[in-house]
């Protein structure tokens, strides 16, 4: 019999995953009565901004709601000791594999926060993606040459040292990155087709092996998107630093220390000691 906490975790995660899909795939219920009435009202008084604002408000609300749900699910995963870094993914029940997605879903939703400081958003999103990629590597779901690291937005004076270093672009590295991106694109295309077929099989009945295959392929699809997102976020860090330098007029000035962060990534605690020191969910 399923334990109450297991059932609660399952329900919270599935609801959050459905909400994430709704947000990212644009499956907003535009046919809903409330939204239709709002659009008709706007068209009647010729104010086109009303439906746009209304839709954006709904999306922002859903993003924040999904983040809170996923953070709760992360705490429950830690509480239930579902993961240990000494395990292999084959040792886990098929139904537990989906919880690998917690940090990557949080990372994706974090990038969609529009009311927070962008530097905080970019840094915290990277923490989530790295946590996801590292766990997938630890459990041998994928083999990566190296797991990307978090690139932080540097203080005004910290970037000068790097700016002095200049030279020709690393063409070999650029070609390797381009080839990697193309390979991931092709693999993702195949994974989407495989997932579609597996989903059809699951609709006919819950077979343990099919469930396992579905979640493994879904995780691999998110691994590919995470690697692409990490590359994009690193570029955004460079852009944020460049913009900060432009605003400062390229003059070194003393800046006030950063205020305490409002965003704190909640990741899965792996062992008892971490829980005692940091709590059930803690920022890395």
Task: Name every feature range the model reports, one short phrase each.
Residues 16, 102-109, 179, 186, ...:
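Conserved small-residue packing positions in alpha-helical repeats and bundles
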Residues 123-138:
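TPR/TPR-like (Sel1-like) alpha-helical repeat modules
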Residues 15-23, 105-108, 169-170:
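Surface-exposed beta-strand-to-loop junctions
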Residues 22, 29-41, 58, 140-284:
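Extended low-complexity, polyampholyte segments enriched in Ser/Thr/Pro and acidic residues
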Residues 2-46, 52-96:
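Internal amphipathic alpha-helical repeat/solenoid segments
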Residues 91-113, 127:
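Elongated alpha-helical scaffolds
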Residues 21, 25-28, 75-82, 109-116, ...:
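Short amphipathic alpha-helices and their capping/turn residues within compact interaction modules
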Residues 118-120:
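Extracellular glycan-interaction surfaces
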């Amino acid at each position: 019999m399923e334990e109450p906490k297991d059932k609660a975790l399952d329900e919270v995660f599935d609801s959050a995953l459905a909400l994430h899909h709704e947000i990212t795939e644009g499956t907003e219920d535009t046919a809903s009565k409330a939204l239709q009435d709002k659009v008709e009202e706007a068209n009647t008084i010729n104010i086109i901004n009303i439906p746009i604002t209304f839709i954006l408000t709904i999306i922002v609300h859903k993003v924040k709601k999904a983040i809170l749900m996923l953070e709760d699910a992360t705490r429950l995963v830690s509480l239930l000791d579902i993961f240990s870094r000494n395990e292999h993914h084959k040792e886990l029940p098929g139904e537990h594999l989906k919880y690998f997605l917690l940090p990557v879903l949080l990372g994706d939703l974090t990038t969609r926060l529009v009311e927070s400081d962008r530097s905080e958003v970019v840094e915290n999103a990277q923490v989530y993606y790295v946590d996801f990629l590292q766990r997938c590597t630890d459990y041998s779901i994928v083999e990566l040459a190296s797991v990307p690291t978090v690139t932080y937005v540097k203080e005004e004076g910290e970037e000068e040292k790097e700016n002095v270093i200049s030279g020709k672009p690393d063409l070999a590295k650029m070609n390797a990155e381009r080839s990697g991106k193309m390979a991931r694109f092709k693999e993702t295309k195949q994974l989407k087709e495989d997932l579609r077929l597996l989903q059809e099989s699951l609709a006919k009945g819950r077979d343990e092996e099919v469930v396992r295959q579905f979640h493994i392929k879904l995780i691999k699809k998110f691994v590919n998107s995470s690697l692409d997102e990490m590359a994009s976020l690193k570029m955004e860090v460079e852009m944020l630093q460049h913009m900060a330098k432009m605003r400062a007029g390229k003059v070194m000035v003393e800046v006030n220390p950063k205020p305490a962060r409002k965003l704190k990534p909640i990741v899965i605690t792996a062992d008892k000691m971490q829980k005692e020191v940091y709590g059930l969910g803690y920022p890395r």
